[in-house]
């Protein structure tokens, strides 16, 4: 007997394919809070006799405990967590699979709360169809528009508009027609291939599995029948072969295979393949599946490929069809959905992960934000939680990808915060930027080592960070004078001075502060490449940007120096009168007052300035630098 499971989507689909080689329909349910999404899926499974009797008994017990009397609370089929039951909401995406005599299904129940839109995006990323629920009493709401837009953005082509709780409006045809007309009107801009509207009552089962006698005016199919028979995209639109290598298999010296799951397309013994990044060519000599050798394999299958030639292939490479190669680039345009409570800041360094790559990346340009309610492009300097933007992204090294609209498997990515390791965004790649192909590194005969040898010194970047008024500039100035007397070649980059020229166009918002440090770090890198000892005196309040600066430099070149002066002392000194203005509310985004300062957690040098003369602190830095240089 078929029954619902709660396991990962990949494992579900593999299990279903092994049961029967027929296609699987992957769909999501989404809508506003309390529209009845979990109740609908629970009713669907129960009425289709896909829930065991002992599970039904548990549901009856849960219904009584939940205050619902003897009536079964079908939402509890999916809402398995105690916290969910107590709060009466679905907290995260719940995956289940089931099958009928006509089709097999994977369903994702996604939350309707505004702050959980990211989970809806997770559920939609692999779905073929979206069941979007609408409360017949409330009609089309903001979340209906939001979820419809995200479904379209994430590549879903087919929609069922489930007008639920039809019993609460006395099965009214005019109200149903008005809701459908409004939805069709606004969704016409979203490019869905089909929209099927079904009036239903998930609570009482009307038009869920069986056609309801209470809706004689409705001539269409009930939900389950429609899901069993809906025609999806034509199978002749075959996506090209993409095989991310997850593991190199070397059980002995005579065998070398490449294990992974086929992301898209199909492959057969004898087919030519190419390593996407290197361009090395070969052909498939053997395909090894869990049950043994086979002649061919297709999307979703875990296999080990053995190649006919000895080519350099490593974990993270991608084997592809030579006739339809993916893009390999370090710059591209993408649609980005932001998940995190902390905003996305252009210029900040994040981790970007794809099927094959994990690489440092920066949003170089936020072109605009997309209003998911009105579909209007709006100017923006950052993205807040649940917002969608179109941006240019640059990665530290080239990555392999397809356009998302052509291949969802290899056209998506996630953004990870470098500090917390939390997933903070997800994106869909539109196209590579031509500039990436037109700009190349010029080979130079004189390198950093030659320039450093000429100066008889090793380059370094001394990065002084601390609050305004902490003494950074005074110490930095004394340090440069000291190094100059020692015959060292230096340059001092000061936070105020660079804002008179290079960064004169930047303000003091979080976005501009990030860009300020990005530019300075790049300049410091060039100066270090020239063989100089670079002294940087900047508040640089954010750890992420200081980490970015460190990663730009050579190993051991970056020395973070925390100029630690208490806020009260900085405010007392107030050499430029800025604290007085900030405390009076006349300066916005002032570090330490109205904008945060993230102190270094593990600096190379921690200078506590209270009771110390700047010259003595400068000497302390010089001594540290000298000892560091002697170690190299």
Swiss-Prot record:
A GO BP annotation: sulfate assimilation
tr-type G domain location: 22-236
GO MF entry, a single one: GTPase activity
G3, as annotated region: 109-112
Region (Adenylyl-sulfate kinase): 458-632
EC nos: 2.7.7.4, 2.7.1.25
Region (G4): 164-167
Task performed by this protein: Proposed to provide activated sulfate for transfer to Nod factor. ATP sulfurylase may be the GTPase, regulating ATP sulfurylase activity.
The name this protein goes by in its record: Bifunctional enzyme NodQ
UniProt organism field: Rhizobium tropici
């Amino acid at each position: 007997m078929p029954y619902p499971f709660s396991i990962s989507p990949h494992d579900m689909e593999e299990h279903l394919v092994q049961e029967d080689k027929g296609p699987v329909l992957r769909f999501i349910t989404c809508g506003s809070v309390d529209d009845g999404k979990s109740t609908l899926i629970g009713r669907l499974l129960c009425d289709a006799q896909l829930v065991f009797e002992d599970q039904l008994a548990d549901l009856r017990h849960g219904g009584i405990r939940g205050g619902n009397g003897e009536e079964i609370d079908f939402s509890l089929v999916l809402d398995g967590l105690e916290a969910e039951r107590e709060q009466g909401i679905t907290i995260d995406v719940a995956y289940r699979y089931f099958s009928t005599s006509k089709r097999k299904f994977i369903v994702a129940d996604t939350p309707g709360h505004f702050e959980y839109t990211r989970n809806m995006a997770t559920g939609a990323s692999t779905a073929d169809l979206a069941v979007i629920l609408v409360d017949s009493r409330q009609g089309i709401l903001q979340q209906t528009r939001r979820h419809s837009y995200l479904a379209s953005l994430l590549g879903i082509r087919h929609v069922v508009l489930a007008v639920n709780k039809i019993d609460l409006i006395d099965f009214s045809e005019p109200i149903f027609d008005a809701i459908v007309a409004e939805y069709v009107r606004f969704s016409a801009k979203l490019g869905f291939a089909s929209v099927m509207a079904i009036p239903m009552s998930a609570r009482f089962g009307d038009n869920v599995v069986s056609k309801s006698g209470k809706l004689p005016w409705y001539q269409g199919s009930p939900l389950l029948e429609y899901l069993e028979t809906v025609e999806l995209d034509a199978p002749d639109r075959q996506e090209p072969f993409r095989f991310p290598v997850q593991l190199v298999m070397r059980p002995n010296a005579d065998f070398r295979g490449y294990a992974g799951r086929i992301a898209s397309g199909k492959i057969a013994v004898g087919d030519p393949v190419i390593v996407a990044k290197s361009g090395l060519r070969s052909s498939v000599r053997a395909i090894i599946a869990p049950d043994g050798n086979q002649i061919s394999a297709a999307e979703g299958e875990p296999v080990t490929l053995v190649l006919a030639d000895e080519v350099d292939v490593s974990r993270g490479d991608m084997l592809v069809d030579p006739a339809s190669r993916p893009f390999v680039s370090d710059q591209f345009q993408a649609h980005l959905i932001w998940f995190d409570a902390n905003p996305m800041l252009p210029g900040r360094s994040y981790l970007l992960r794809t099927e094959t790559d994990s690489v440092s990346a920066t949003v170089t340009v936020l072109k605009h934000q997309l209003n998911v309610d009105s579909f209007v492009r709006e100017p923006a300097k950052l993205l807040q939680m649940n917002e969608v933007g179109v941006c240019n992204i640059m990665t530290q090294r080239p990555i392999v990808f397809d356009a998302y609209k052509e291949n969802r498997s290899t056209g998506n990515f996630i953004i990870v915060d470098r500090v917390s390791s939390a997933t903070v965004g997800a994106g869909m790649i539109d196209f590579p930027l031509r500039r990436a192909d037109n700009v190349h590194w010029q080979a130079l005969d004189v390198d950093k080592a030659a320039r450093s040898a000429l100066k008889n010194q090793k380059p370094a970047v001394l990065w002084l960070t601390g609050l305004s008024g902490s003494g950074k500039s005074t110490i930095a100035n004394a340090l440069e004078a000291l190094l100059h007397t020692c015959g060292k070649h230096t340059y001092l980059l000061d936070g105020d001075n660079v804002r008179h020229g290079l960064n004169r166009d930047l303000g003091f918002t979080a976005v501009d502060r990030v860009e300020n440090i990005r530019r300075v770090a790049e300049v410091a890198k060039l100066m270090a490449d020239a063989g100089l000892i670079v002294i940087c005196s900047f508040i640089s309040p954010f750890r992420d940007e200081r980490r970015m600066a460190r990663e730009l430099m050579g190993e051991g070149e970056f020395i973070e120096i925390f100029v630690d002066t208490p806020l009260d002392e900085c405010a007392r000194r107030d050499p430029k009168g800025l604290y007085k203005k900030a405390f009076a509310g006349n300066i916005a985004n002032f570090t330490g007052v109205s904008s945060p300062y993230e102190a270094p957690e593990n600096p190379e040098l921690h200078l506590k300035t209270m009771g110390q003369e700047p010259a003595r602190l400068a000497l302390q830095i010089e001594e540290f630098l000298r000892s560091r240089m002697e170690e190299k």
